[in-house]
Every structure is written in structure tokens, then in C-alpha cells.
């Protein structure tokens, strides 16, 4: 379970995913390439016509926090070769064929924040996506690059993340 949960958190953050996008990923949507991982998103909140998009997650320098390597490890341990990559466990902790719910992502986020001693009332499944956008802005990514990864259709929300990321920069 901990390998699945770590993969959910790292892939969710590394790809700037909404929790509904994250739980909808199937094994068939994955393509491991030399640069990292391509994930086909079939539909999202702002893509109601199902045009889809491809998200690319590069390898991270720190292997412990690399979404690509951790997902490979989860798939190897779980022996998942088709269908949902993020599945429920039974009460006896056997892996089922059933896809996790988006609420499960919220609950596991809160569980791990609690274990880390972090007040979790201000965190939810969306925190992975907003965290990605904020860190990308702090690292100097422009709003179009952030929007391409997160799937935002307008600059309004992305600019909010950039403003939050820049509040301490160039502070007079």
C-alpha cells in the first residue's frame, strides 16, 4: 500500500494532475521513454469533448522522489499489466481490480500529512496540482508552460500560483 500511495503522491505532483485525472490513468495510457514517462489523459474537467492530452514527466535527479521510478516500482510490485494503475486494497490488504475513487486520494493525502505532523485541514487532492504549479512558478517556468502541463484553459488561476510563488522575490 505504501508503494501505491507514494506513487500517487509523486505522480500527482510531478504531473500537476487533478485527482480525477490521476485515478483515471490506466496501464495502457503509460509510455515509458528515455526522458521519463508520457501519460495519455483521455478526458478532464476542462476537456469535456475528450480531445485528450499527453503529459510528460521527466526523471528527477533524486531517485527517492522521482515519480517515474516510483511508478515503475509500484507497477513491478503490484504486477499490474492492464487496467487501472491506482487500485483499491481489500480489507485483507489484497490488491483488487477496482479503481480508487477521487475521495480516496483526498483521504490518503490527509493520512500522510497527519503522519508527517502537518496540519492537514488546508490540504486536499487538489494540493498536488496547485503545489506543482507553485513550484514550477518558483523555478521560473512561464505561465504557458505551466498551463500546458496542468491543463488550465485560462491564465487567471495560473497567475495566482505565480503571484504566490513570487511574494518573497524582489521584496523591497
Task: Report residues per predicted region.
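Residue-level marker of regulatory loop/turn positions in helix-turn-helix DNA-binding domains and
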Residues: 1, 63, 101, 125-126
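Short pre-functional
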Residues: 3-23, 134-138
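Conserved tyrosine-mediated DNA breakage-rejoining catalytic core shared by Y-recombinases
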Residues: 15, 20-68, 73-76
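Active-site/catalytic core of tyrosine-dependent DNA strand-transfer enzymes
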Residues: 60-119
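Short, basic (Lys/Arg/His-rich) helix/loop patches that form interaction surfaces
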Residues: 80-81, 106-148, 155, 167
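Catalytic-site neighborhood detector that most strongly recognizes the C-terminal catalytic loop/helix
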Residues: 150-172
Amino acid at each position: 500500500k505504501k508503494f501505491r500511495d507514494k506513487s500517487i503522491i509523486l505522480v500527482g505532483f510531478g504531473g500537476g494532475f487533478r485527482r480525477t485525472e490521476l485515478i483515471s490513468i490506466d496501464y495502457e495510457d503509460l509510455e515509458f521513454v528515455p526522458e521519463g514517462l508520457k501519460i495519455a489523459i483521455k478526458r478532464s474537467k476542462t476537456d469535456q469533448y475528450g480531445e485528450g492530452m499527453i503529459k510528460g514527466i521527466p526523471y528527477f535527479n533524486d531517485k527517492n522522489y522521482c515519480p517515474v521510478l516510483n511508478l515503475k516500482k509500484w507497477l513491478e510490485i503490484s504486477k499490474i499489466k492492464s487496467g487501472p494503475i491506482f487500485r483499491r486494497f481489500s480489507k485483507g490488504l489484497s490488491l483488487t481490480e477496482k479503481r480508487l475513487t477521487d475521495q480516496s486520494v483526498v483521504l490518503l493525502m490527509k493520512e500522510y500529512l497527519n503522519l508527517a505532523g502537518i496540519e492537514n485541514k488546508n490540504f486536499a487532492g487538489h494540493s498536488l496540482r496547485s503545489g506543482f504549479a507553485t513550484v514550477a512558478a518558483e523555478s521560473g517556468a512561464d505561465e504557458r508552460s505551466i498551463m500546458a502541463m496542468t491543463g488550465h484553459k485560462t491564465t487567471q488561476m495560473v497567475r495566482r500560483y505565480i503571484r504566490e510563488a513570487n511574494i518573497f522575490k524582489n521584496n523591497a
